[in-house]
């Protein structure tokens, strides 16, 4: 059986910023936690008490354009970029107090959360955690979206992105073994993106109240609108891998598998994560 020591942060760290969808400011307070706590978000209720929202599939509330968790009256939106950084750095136990309903977007990538982990430092804890391994393939398909996971001794993600409506994105493919180093260098810097012709719809729906060129890349047929150039020629597919890592972290336990994805988004990622969890619990 694969196993490693559990991890938390060495000290508390804070970060304030604006949420990309709601457009409201929020402050994160990341606090070390004891072994076997898991990742737990906290929102302060009207009475002043903190409501716990474990970062688990059971608490996924919505998956439109981002992944939102909820428990009781507490809601935490857009958790995927933070969760991807925690998962890829093997952070198992953490209390995350959030003053608002949405995680700050930073620059649209996971860089700010990797930097927070570095500021706090990583604490190796006494207890071990088992790393689950699939014993059979797992599949999910909905229309032209496809996901599969195969037994492996490492976490590897192979993603195919197909955007026929955008000649500047087109078809992109990336396959990568996910570990702390590869995530930091190859995935964490990759920003969220949108198509130019989607922006009016998103604005009308109030879905990008905090979106700007400081935290997203906009793709047009004849180029991009961005602060600077793309960080990678295939930045969109890499960001899709980032989102997938964050969503699958809600399985709630570390696991290894070779994950294949074609055109998946938050809704399909979460549905697929539930199938993986079922397979691991057999």
From Swiss-Prot:
The keyword Metal-binding applies. The active site is at 266 (proton donor). Keywords: Hydrolase, Lipid A biosynthesis, Lipid biosynthesis, Lipid metabolism, Metal-binding, Zinc. GO terms for cellular component: membrane. One of its GO terms (biological process) is lipid A biosynthetic process. SUPFAM superfamilies: Ribosomal protein S5 domain 2-like. It catalyses: a UDP-3-O-[(3R)-3-hydroxyacyl]-N-acetyl-alpha-D-glucosamine + H2O = a UDP-3-O-[(3R)-3-hydroxyacyl]-alpha-D-glucosamine + acetate. It is an enzyme of class 3 (hydrolase). Pathway: Glycolipid biosynthesis; lipid IV(A) biosynthesis; lipid IV(A) from (3R)-3-hydroxytetradecanoyl-[acyl-carrier-protein] and UDP-N-acetyl-alpha-D-glucosamine: step 2/6. Zn(2+) binds at residues 81, 239, 243. Its cofactor is Zn(2+). It comes from the Bacteria. InterPro entries: Ribosomal_Su5_D2-typ_SF (IPR020568), UDP-acyl_GlcNac_deAcase (IPR004463), UDP-acyl_GlcNac_deAcase_C (IPR011334), UDP-acyl_N-AcGlcN_deAcase_N (IPR015870). GO terms for molecular function: metal ion binding; UDP-3-O-acyl-N-acetylglucosamine deacetylase activity. Its EC number is 3.5.1.108. Catalyzes the hydrolysis of UDP-3-O-myristoyl-N-acetylglucosamine to form UDP-3-O-myristoylglucosamine and acetate, the committed step in lipid A biosynthesis. Belongs to the LpxC family. This is UDP-3-O-acyl-N-acetylglucosamine deacetylase. The gene is lpxC.
């Amino acid at each position: 059986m694969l196993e490693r020591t559990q991890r938390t942060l060495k000290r508390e760290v804070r970060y304030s910023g604006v949420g990309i969808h709601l457009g409201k400011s929020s402050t994160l307070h990341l606090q070390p936690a004891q072994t076997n706590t898991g990742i737990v978000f906290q929102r302060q209720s009207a009475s002043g008490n903190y409501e716990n929202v474990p970062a688990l599939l059971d608490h996924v509330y919505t998956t439109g354009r981002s992944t939102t968790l909820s428990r009781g009256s507490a809601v935490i939106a857009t958790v995927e970029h933070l969760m991807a950084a925690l998962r890829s750095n093997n952070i198992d136990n953490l209390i995350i107090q959030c003053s608002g309903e949405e995680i700050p977007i930073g620059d649209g990538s996971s860089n700010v959360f990797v930097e927070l982990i570095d500021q706090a430092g990583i604490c190796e804890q006494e207890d071990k955690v088992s790393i689950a391994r699939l014993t059979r393939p797992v599949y999910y398909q909905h229309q032209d979206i496809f996901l599969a996971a195969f037994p492996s001794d490492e976490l590897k993600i192979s993603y195919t992105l197909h955007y026929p409506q955008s000649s500047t994105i087109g078809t992109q493919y990336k396959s990568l073994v996910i570990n702390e180093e590869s995530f930091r260098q190859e995935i964490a810097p990759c920003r969220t993106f949108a198509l130019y012709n989607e922006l009016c719809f998103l604005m009308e729906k109030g879905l990008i109240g905090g979106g700007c060129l400081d935290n997203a890349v906009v793709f047009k047929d004849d180029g991009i609108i961005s602060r600077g150039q793309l960080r990678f020629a295939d930045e969109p597919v890499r960001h899709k891998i980032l989102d997938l890592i964050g969503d699958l972290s809600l399985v709630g336990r570390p696991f290894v598998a070779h994950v294949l994805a074609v055109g998946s988004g938050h809704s399909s990622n979460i549905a697929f994560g539930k199938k993986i969890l079922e397979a691991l619990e057999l």
